[in-house]
Each structure stands twice: as C-alpha cells, then as structure tokens.
Amino acid sequence: MMRLRSDPDVTIDEITSVVETDPALAAQVMSWASSSYYASQSKIRSVEDAIVRVLGVDLVINLALSLSLGKSLSLPKDNPQSSTPYWQQSIYTAAVIEGLTRAMPRELRPEVGMTYLGGLLHNFGYLLLAYVFPPHFSLICRHLEVNPHVSHSLIEQHLLGISREQMGAWLMRFWGMPEELAIAVRFQHDPAYIGTDAHYPNLVCVALGLLQNRGIGHGACAPLPDALFERLGVSRDKAEAVVSKVLEAEVLLREMAAQFGQA
C-alpha cells in the first residue's frame, strides 16, 4: 500500500489485486462502499466496483493504509476519561480536513488525498506512546484527567522527555511515508507553523481546534488565530460550516469508525 500510495501511475487493477489478497481488507472496502455515508445508488458487487463507482483510488489507498498501520499497534486499554475514541476522532478529523481542503482556493490547495491521510494518522503517536511506554502511559492518562487545561504535549514532555507528535513523526519517516505526513503529525498543534508544507499541519490544527470546540477530542484547546485561517484562504465562518456539515453525518461517521475498531 505504501508503494502504491507513492506511485503516480498506479492502476485500478493493481489496487484491486492488492486489496483482494487480504480478505478482511476486501470485506472492509466493500462495507465502506456500501455504507449510506457514501450514498451509492446501486449494489456494490466487487472490490473493483467499490473503487471505480464509489470510493475512488485515493480514498481506498488512504483508508486501507490507515487500517493496515493501525493493525500494527493495538489500541490501548487505558485511556483518559471523557476522551473521544481513537478511530472516531481520526475519522472526524479526516472528514473535516477534506472539507477544509476543498474549500481552499485552488492555487493554495494541497493534495486532498494527502491531507485526508494526515487527518487519519494525525494521532498515531498516541498508539506508539502506549506501545513503547506502557507503564508510563497510564500515568500520562491520569495526569491528563486531572489537568484537562494543560496540553498533552507538555505533560508528555514533562514525564517522558518526548511527545506523541515527535514519536509519530519519527515513525512516519521510519516507515518511508511522505514527508508531508511527518510534518503534519509533528506540527499539528502549532498554529504559528509557516515552514515547509505548512498547509498540512495547519489543516490538522484547524480541524482539531474546531472539533474540540464542539466537544470532540480531549485536553486544552488553544485559540485559533485569524492568521491561520488567512494562510489557508478559508474564512472562520466557512470552516465552521464545514464542521457542521461533517457533524450532520455523525451517526454514519461513528459507524465507519466502529468498522476500523473491529478490523
């Protein structure tokens, strides 16, 4: 999937054959395509059908890649109380980022598929944190519960000397993922970031902030400066409208997140 993701000449047949070699993944793709969230007008009869008529190449690769990477690290059993479930937040964030990206002026707009994948994988460092530091992870969860006004990055730096964003960015690079993804993961909570490929972390930052304002997510919510919206070419009102539209499909998005959790 990583090779296909980086191949500009990838064909439908190549993607179909890779998906079909994994029965669980093939069933998942069929399930996504048949979901009422994508509103297919007719029955989906094959993986190729799902890709060509409903989901498209980019979305299938990104969803399958996220699912495959997610399988490599299991969800932690311990979580901060009142936190949004991992895949639920990932799906919401990706959906909002997709809407924000499409709302950007064409001359500023980054690759939609890449920004969507950045949303799906933005919190992957959380899984890595739980996997690498299991004894410390529970301690981090307890600190987050009693200090909801403090950024998780500060707590993690205090207890471990490293944050989930740093770990997640390292893992993206270690796995040979596109550099845009590593940057999106590393700088997702920095509204002032204007470095290389800034649109990717800026989009994650806006999506996370707006969702937190609607009660989705966990922890301290830093204000989103006007300059951040200006760099993306999207007004604050338009961005809020994107979030509202995504949340109209909340039930369907939760179903999709549940499928990720069961895979």
Regions found by a protein language model. Give the residues of each.
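Conserved alpha-helical "signature site"
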Residues: 1-141, 148-224
